Amino acid sequence: IRDRGCTMLVSEDTDLTAKDLSGGIGEIALLDICEEPEALAARLRDVQQYVMEHSPHRIPALFHCEALGGPVVPHTVLYPNSIGLGATFDTALVRDMTNTIRTQMRAMGILHALSPVLDVAKDLRWGRVNETYGGDPTLSAAMSCAFVQGLQGDDLSTGVAATAKHFLGYSQTVGGLNLTRTQADARELREVFAKPFEAAIRKAGIRTVMNSYSEWEGRPVCASRKLLTNLLRSELSFDGLVVSDYRSVQRLLDDILATADDITDAALQCLTAGLDMELPDRLGYADGMTHAFAEGKVDISYLDRAVLRVLTLKFELGLFDEPYPQWQQYHAAAFAPTAAAEQRATRESIVLTKNEGNTLPLTDRSIKLAVIGPGASSLRLLYGGYTQPSMLEMFQVVQDSSAMAGVGDKSTAKPVRKYDLAATDREIHKSRPEAKTIFEALQELYPNCTYTQGCDYLDPTQTDFAAALAAAESADAVILCLSGKNGWGRHCDTGEGNLSLIHI
């Protein structure tokens, strides 16, 4: 049972005896990572040694983190969000990107990436569109295959296991809301939303799949045999590991659907449907499940099947041969300068919708330039969710805020404070000192350049339109940087939160 469970590790976790590691653990979720890569590798070596010493069979843990445009670790590679990469139509660029991510994660000892996002974004109200490659299933399929091929490599024993998420129909929910019902019939589900997953399975050999938070035909996806076994395995021929999106099992108790009597019942529903491993902690796949098997409430073959899939993936990754981070082997190549490649990807991701009168480029560097808008002066607003800069604020419980689904509870919370965007920018600058705001970059090119905020990115009452108009009228050209903020909580205007429908 323990090898099919997981526990979370955050920066403050220095006492391993206080963690759920006694008897071993299947995976460890790395969240709120503050260490630089070499220090993190050293820390994970110590954690792995502790896990193996406390495992009856010395089974190593598998570490995982998000890696959509780079590992969520300071001083690692950081590419544009997937929606920008989709705009490049450049599969070779994506493959090169994930090849770099692969070597960096290998060096640090993180062999499981909870990426890519293969949801097809048809409803632009859905807050996680930026994590996808857009609304074309064929483009998403091509990009996802490139992502997986670069990340897993030609031989998985030197690669990182990719995760196709979120299976299935997560982006096509009622009203574009998170954690709600998928609005797609069986045909559309297969022909549109399953297409990128099938490509990643058949053409790229992806090794793990993560369930969607949504429900389909009255069943939560994590407990749907129709989706996780009949469709995913029998029709699409997936033979790898299925992991839960964070605390999906618990949702069988918490939400309006409420299909389970207790957490053990919820876990058994998920296990028999085809969910092999529970992330990010052991709530259902725990002692209650052990007792259920001992009492003969469910066939032991379901447990054997899941354990085999977990151990198979660990063997494929070479974890039993080399369980520790391979810093010496990989770090030189992994952390060679990548700025040129990242800048190329960023340039290719930018879409010019029109250029009337050949206004661009602004070749005269002496012009008076007015830069207006909240997006020009903040580093944080440049980054989407599931990037290292946005993860810096994930566990900061903000007044009147909702957190990322699956992690916003008291066990991971930091002290409550009012959200401070400038403070987040300062933290980003510490981990990425080379980063510049749009205004800072423009100042280097146009000496006669001024900045006016004009409005807030979120609060409609915080405006100074008069100052913005005055700046525009006195300038030769205006660069207007309107922006939202993508991430978790009510201090963001797009992204993922734990609110779905209003609960009474």
Q: Would you name each region that the model predicts?
A:
Residues 1-502:
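Glycoside hydrolase catalytic-domain context in secreted enzymes
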